[in-house]
A protein has these predicted regions:
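Short, solvent-exposed loop/turn segments at secondary-structure junctions
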Residues: 31, 114, 158, 423, ...
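Extracellular/periplasmic catalytic domains that process cell-envelope and extracellular macromolecules
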Residues: 23-25, 101, 144-145, 308-309, ...
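Secreted/periplasmic carbohydrate-active enzymes, especially glycoside hydrolases
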Residues: 1-7, 11-12, 17-356, 399, ...
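An acidic, glycine-rich "communication" segment
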Residues: 749-804
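Short alpha-beta junction capping motif
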Residues: 720-763, 780
Length: 804
């Protein structure tokens, strides 16, 4: 016990020393010089040898610093940057290296640069890096001797390779093509014998973790040392404590250690996101170096139809993150910001985020580890000519390896894909998958999100398989359908970018845009309304179309929950996508905040680990028919459900019961879609046209409901109305006589309509999709004050129909 205590204290002291003396934080005011024409590297104009005269704050971007061109444009297809800058930008400051750092290895860490970054020390070039997804690191041991030095960094945000315009690593349409360094900026000193890398490979079957440790020895000669390893439950008790004598050759040394985690391991998953900490300390030549990581005891495997976490099928209820950060124009590098997003995702019943054609900073992985969110990261790849440009191919391969090295320990990182809807030479993409699988087996890999299924795919995200469409964009008049046949292929399939139903913008949101982008697209849309004399109806239009989108997403989600062999879905979106034509497709705004359209509790009725489902052959009935519904349960909760009781009740618009009953339910295992029973209800007591609602509740805990519409089978014509299908002489005469005419034309010129609202948005690809032959609308807004609607509403003043 005493030995354990002393060892822990020694390790703690070593870490404190590291934190206090071996890092220099370089955040703050830097000198700055714009260089959009790129002259700063040419002979005679060397900015890296000059003292820059302007100033800027780092971490940050040129947009935040007010550098570049002040814009006046008003883009309707995206948010507009207030300041646009493209090209080389120079950042400079003095740094003082302490005497204690003499003879140490010194690294410059630049987190989240955009894009190519070249470093100079005292006017001499050190090198360039081009990572978009991981920190750019530069070894400065020879240059950063004790004393003062001038550190100059050139960041160039011009596209280095042909990247197309859409990928979310470089696009203007979401995060913007900013210039700067927006994460940690620091110098770090290490001993010449140091722990360079530490990876954890958990094995839940043997209850062990294999630690892969890379130790660098730059002393110029072999040496001996002591490696001490401590594994703790994060914030809790010690699990293992070991030390090993080691012999190190000059250069890089790989050490493999398998460590028992004990009998009572805590597994990581969405319900129990337990984490462990590894603290490694190396003592060599009477000097110490340490490195810490966190990991989870979790295993990801490919099941027949589902991704499996720790041997159990999971169903991914996911949403997309397309790198939308309206205040900064770039992704956050703080854990708390990401926890807020992931907790919101969890509040709405989801367990998964796909990072669409980009990879987030490490803070996102840490936050997902803690919250219990399954992540899919991607390369910044969305291209139509895969295989072209060898330099670009090399960039993607290096970026892939860098992502795996940087974020591979995180248990939330369960999926990796090359990118979005790629086209071209898929042999190149499959080669990347094979290399990734060989390099790191701690997650599953796929060649491309959509377009082509390759033999190496361990899962497949797509609109369609060889057996048909799996993505669902809208509901149907029936709910007695699913995508089971279409999902039955040789690996788990996840429905790609479901939903995408457009709603009207919420102009009240405009005041939130206090950062680097301006909502000038909102301004244009608002002015159009004003010109047409409808600005006073803007909020009504937003709420009407928003209610309709909520209704459609209920249908979309439930259709894939009914699909027992579905691997999951990725909704587009839970939050708005303000680019590519201004796609207001989210029930949350671009800030991941509620629009006030639906509460998390209500949304979870149709999107949660446990959801009640109803298979109905239709939704409209005559009152001489019998309403039927087959009731099911989707259960991917943490624990099996005990035997219980399902209560059902059909109510009218006043809350009166048409009929009710209950069904005894069996025990429900986890990871299943099971039948619960059937209801048959005669509708002969319904005397007039009205909407009825079927309410279901299981064990007083889980609730869901569905609307149906019932009409009288005996049609009666009002005496004071003339009913007509064409405008003819009979109609004219009736009107001249002062009679009322109900005209329902048979043939109307114009485009067809359907229940679903506009796909994505009306401004992008308006001729690209066959179903856009239908009218481009976001649904109807109806005041039910006409006598036609009186049968539906008792109190006209207090009812507004937001969706027909």
């Amino acid at each position: 016990m005493k030995k354990s205590f002393l060892f822990a204290m020694m390790l703690c002291c070593a870490q404190l020393l590291s934190a206090q003396q071996e890092r220099i934080d370089l955040s703050g005011t830097w000198r700055f010089q714009a260089d959009p024409m790129g002259f700063g590297k040419t002979p005679g104009s060397e900015l890296y040898q000059a003292k820059l005269t302007e100033s800027i704050m780092l971490p940050g971007s040129t947009d935040e610093g007010g550098k570049g061109m002040l814009t006046t444009a008003r883009y309707v297809d995206r948010l507009t940057r207030k300041f646009e800058y493209c090209g080389q930008a120079w950042y400079q400051r003095e740094v003082i290296i302490p005497e204690e750092w003499k003879d140490k290895e010194i690294t410059l860490n630049l987190e989240r640069c955009h894009w190519e970054t070249t470093v100079y020390v005292d006017g001499k070039e050190i090198g360039a890096k081009e990572h978009l997804s991981v920190p750019n690191r530069f070894l400065l041991s020879k240059q950063m001797t004790p004393g003062m030095h001038i550190l100059t960094i050139c960041v160039d945000n011009r596209l280095k390779y042909p990247m197309d315009q859409w990928n979310h690593g470089t696009t203007e349409y979401t995060q913007t093509n900013w210039n700067g360094i927006v994460g940690k900026i620091e110098l770090t000193a290490y001993e010449k014998t140091n722990i360079h890398a530490l990876k954890a490979y958990p094995d839940i079957e043997t209850r062990t973790v294999t630690l892969d440790i890379t130790v660098n020895n730059t002393t110029g000669q072999p040496t001996n040392g002591l490696l001490q390893l401590v594994i703790n439950e994060k914030g809790g008790k010690t699990v293992s404590e070991q030390s090993f004598p080691i012999t190190l050759k000059e250069g890089s040394n790989q050490l493999i250690k398998e460590i028992s985690m004990g009998k009572n391991i805590k597994l990581w998953n969405e319900f129990t996101p337990y984490l462990y900490e590894v603290k490694a300390m190396l003592t060599a030549d009477n000097k110490q170096d340490s490195k810490n990581i966190t990991f989870g005891m979790r295993e990801v495997t490919q099941g027949k139809h589902h991704i499996q976490i720790n041997g159990r099928n999971v169903h991914l209820r996911g949403a997309l993150d397309c790198c939308v950060f309206p205040l900064t124009g770039y992704p956050s590098t703080t854990i708390e910001d990401w926890k807020r997003i992931f907790l919101t995702v969890n509040d709405y019943g989801m367990n998964h985020i796909r990072f669409h054609s980009w990879c987030p900073p490490e803070a996102a992985f840490h936050a997902a580890d803690e919250v219990g969110i399954y992540l899919q990261a991607e390369l910044p790849m969305w291209i139509k000519d895969v295989g072209q440009y060898p330099a670009r191919r090399d960039f993607f391969e290096k970026e892939m390896y860098a992502i795996l090295e940087e974020y591979g320990n995180h248990p939330s990182f369960i999926l990796m894909c090359n990118g979005n809807e790629n086209e071209g030479n898929f042999n190149v993409l499959e080669d990347l998958v094979k290399k990734a699988q060989k390099h790191d087996n701690r997650r599953l890999y796929s060649a491309s999100t959509a377009r082509t299924h390759t033999p190496s795919d361990q899962y497949y995200v797509s609109h369609v398989t060889e057996k048909g469409w799996i993505t669902v964009y809208e509901g149907k008049p029936s709910t007695d359908w699913d995508r089971k046949k279409e999902s039955d292929i040789d690996c788990p399939v996840i429905a790609h970018e479901t939903g995408q139903r457009c709603m009207y913008p919420n102009f009240a949101e405009m005041e939130k845009y206090t950062g680097v982008v301006s909502p000038r697209n909102f301004e244009v849309f608002r002015e159009r309304l004003a010109r047409n004399g409808m600005l006073h109806q803007a909020d009504d239009f937003f709420r009407a179309t928003g209610a309709h989108t909520v209704l459609q997403y209920k249908e979309v989600n439930e259709s894939l929950l009914r699909t027992a062999n579905s691997g999951g879905f990725q909704l587009l979106g839970l939050a708005d996508f303000p680019g590519q034509g201004s796609a207001f497709v989210g029930i949350l705004d671009a800030f991941w905040e509620s629009k006030g359209l639906v509460s998390p509790e209500k949304y979870r009725e149709s999107c949660a680990p446990t959801v009640l489902l109803a298979r109905m052959p239709k939704r409209t009935y005559m009152n001489n028919e019998t309403f039927t519904a087959k009731l099911e349960i989707y259960h991917y909760g943490e624990h099996p459900l005990k035997r219980g009781k399902l209560n059902w009740e059909l109510k009218d618009g006043k809350g009166n019961t048409v009929k009710k009953g209950n069904i005894s339910t069996p025990a429900i295992p986890c990871a299943t879609v099971d039948s619960l029973g059937k209801v048959n209800i005669s509708l002969n007591k319904v005397s007039h046209a009205e909407k009825l609602t079927l309410h279901t509740t299981l064990n007083d805990t889980y609730h869901n409901e569905w609307d149906i519409w019932v009409y009288p089978c005996q049609q009666t014509a009002a005496d004071d109305y003339v009913y007509a299908r064409t405008y003819d002489e009979k109609v004219k005469t009736a009107l001249q006589q002062g009679k009322k005419v109900l005209l329902i034309p048979e043939n109307v010129k114009g485009r067809k309509t359907k229940f679903a609202s506009h796909f994505w948005n009306p401004h992008k690809n308006t001729c690209s999709f066959s179903y856009l032959a239908y009218a481009s609308w976001c649904r109807a807004y109806i005041f039910p004050i006409h006598s036609l609607y009186r049968v539906y509403y008792d109190n006209i003043r207090h009812h507004v129909s937001y969706a027909v």
